Amino acid sequence: MKTIGLVVGHHCDTALEIKAAILAKDASVTVLLDEGDFVEPAADATDALKEATRKINNFNAVKRLQKAGADVIGFACGCPHRFFAELQTEFTVRLVDPACDSGERLSAADYAQALLTADVTPLPKPFKVGMIGGLGPAATVDLYDKIVKATPAKTDQEHFKLVVEQNPQIPDRTKCLLEGGDNPTLSMYNCAKRLEEDDCDCIIVPCNTAHAFVALIEPFVGIPFINMQQVTMQEIQEKFGDKAVIGLMATTGTVRSGLYGQKAEAMGMPMYVPDDEHQARVMAAIYGPQGAKAGFTDGVCREDLSSAAEYLVKTHGCNVLILGCTELPLILDEGFMTIAGKEVFIIDPTSALARRVVKVAQEAAAERGVL
């Protein structure tokens, strides 16, 4: 059974006339009237402000009707004709223009017929990515920057939608795993549900260690996560095949959690981690007083990280190094680098995730026919 929504505004009599015409043609239809208050601009408001007020009043009314379950929505007032395309762009529910191409208002009978025969198939929804941000703040900005740079767009409008649920107060993931500190599960879950409620299509997390908790919340979230470790390991396999000898530089929490190690083992790729001395230097590069989380990207933190990289290459013959904490790419760049006299590829999981997100978004846009 079709449900038609009508925005009443200041035109109650017209709305009732249209409703009566609809029911006279098809009594099985449900007609919802939105009689929410319309904000009135000040008497001395500019024409631009008055028109913006009309747009926003109608936008809010359409949103209420869509939430109430309307399949198609019409207007008792003819003014939405002036900004009809702009209004329709913001919704997947079908709207019906109250006027003909010339701008003349349709009669109640003609408009009722237009509403009754309107296609109720929702318009395709633009792809939207949700990011749980604040893990940490600089890594969040870094991932977003890499997504923007990886997107082959020539105009602002060719980029896809992305929402960041920024919550730097999410408890420290490494402390939880290593010291029994506050658990971030509920904070991350709350962020994920907010992104789901905001109509996102997928969720990304700009923190390697946080992925240890993603598996705990994933079953309770209705949209998929794009897993940073998975896409990183897939890129390594595609690039190096069975020639890859991988070294992992990450937080001790990530190392012990097996986020990368388990995937490497399942894919048949050897992976090594630093010894205790060099793992301590990796942690210092991240958490130390002159580390990345303190805002440093050169000097002592670079020396610490380079020392761990050299250990992995010299001791285990690694030819691929994973920057397995999202702060580490702030210190070392992705790409080929000579370490201990050997050419080694440094892969940034943040960049790998950005590339995959762009690919998924482009494929969705092509399938849906809308950005």
Give the location of each predicted region.
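Non-catalytic structural scaffold of enzyme domains
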Residues: M1-L371
